[in-house]
Amino acid sequence: MNTALAQQIANEGGVEAWMIAQQHKSLLRFLTCGSVDDGKSTLIGRLLHDTRQIYEDQLSSLHNDSKRHGTQGEKLDLALLVDGLQAEREQGITIDVAYRYFSTEKRKFIIADTPGHEQYTRNMATGASTCELAILLIDARKGVLDQTRRHSFISTLLGIKHLVVAINKMDLVDYSEETFTRIREDYLTFAEQLPGNLDIRFVPLSALEGDNVASQSESMPWYSGPTLLEVLETVEIQRVVDAQPMRFPVQYVNRPNLDFRGYAGTLASGRVEVGQRVKVLPSGVESNVARIVTFDGDREEAFAGEAITLVLTDEIDISRGDLLLAADEALPAVQSASVDVVWMAEQPLSPGQSYDIKIAGKKTRARVDGIRYQVDINNLTQREVENLPLNGIGLVDLTFDEPLVLDRYQQNPVTGGLIFIDRLSNVTVGAGMVHEPVSQATAAPSEFSAFELELNALVRRHFPHWGARDLLGDK
């Protein structure tokens, strides 16, 4: 146990009191992103070091690793605390998304250290999908680069509203206020292309020296704003899902005995209370909430993000993938939608292809009707393309095999976020954010039966040399 943790436990009056205090702290998930060698891993290492989250044996190992792999001469190479893969240490870069956890007296944190290289865009999108704040590192010597713009775009595309522009390596430009001001103005000019409801803050710092990371810098008296840690501790995160209507995707039907039938899942948005009238989609059947069951016993109400089991007053047909919402809300099912797609497979996404998709616990199929455009994520321009390559981001039109109940991703990431699954290999090949549900569901009959579709998939998987075409994708 490190000395800082031991002191915190002593101050709280014991382990149990400390654990209770930890449970009631707010949690902030954030990611660090920037161009290669901007100091992302060093910054996280500095945060862990200066908040005294490193154990003595880790510190001793860090001294030895700094001599073997370090790039900072006689100084501690704090990036080695985060760059865990052997390939990362040898190359001095970050490849995979590395998660780290730490806490202060005010808040708990989960950090995602995401790769800066363009070929790892899919890794960054994965890390950003669960975060509420993004730290965008900029090398003070280089200013705003294409990768800075790319990371800003991806962060906002995935719903992040709080951006902290950390202008790093100020020690290498003699802590120049003019350099900081110029980069700040350049970024604000670029940010005019981003959504207008963003909270953007700027902090000049040196992750290597510790200036303005966890403590105020004496080398930059011209900067009177908060340190990076103070920003992280005090930023107010207002979750969009709290103000949205009730959405409860059913993950599991729990029937341990003949006297109990409950529907388990995580409340995606809004709130639910005992006695509330709810509607099941897509069937449209209505009922009342009889009980809200949790691990700690029954509750009278539940809020977004809580894992609960709902018991209804009526015995109705509900299965995994169905959606419960307030009975008085009119939410039509849709057969198609425009979707922002981050493509993650070597084989490009092309019109006419079909994939399994998974959204809020429901699995179905979708066909790619067309690609409206691909976004050049370096300058945010749009261009027409025939297919979407690996790490490409674009707006795609999808038609679903059955009616779905969708929200826009910016309103509800759970009922607006989906993944693409290759039907032969069962590998996740893309991530999608619903841009707009575009048409109401129609009762058009299917050309092929479910048995024929399953048989077709089986033949193409085990007998590819037969050359059987995909009945859904017509390829």
From Swiss-Prot:
Its EC number is 2.7.7.4. It catalyses: sulfate + ATP + H(+) = adenosine 5'-phosphosulfate + diphosphate. One of its GO terms (biological process) is hydrogen sulfide biosynthetic process. Residues 113-116 are annotated as: G3. Pathway: Sulfur metabolism; hydrogen sulfide biosynthesis; sulfite from sulfate: step 1/3. The keyword GTP-binding applies. Residues 92-96 are annotated as: G2. It holds the Pfam family GTP_EFTU. Keywords: ATP-binding, GTP-binding, Nucleotide-binding, Nucleotidyltransferase, Transferase. Residues 34-41 are annotated as: G1. GTP binds at residues 34-41, 113-117, 168-171. PANTHER family: TRANSLATION FACTOR. This is Sulfate adenylyltransferase subunit 1. The lineage of its organism: Bacteria, Pseudomonadati, Pseudomonadota, Gammaproteobacteria, Enterobacterales. The gene is cysN.
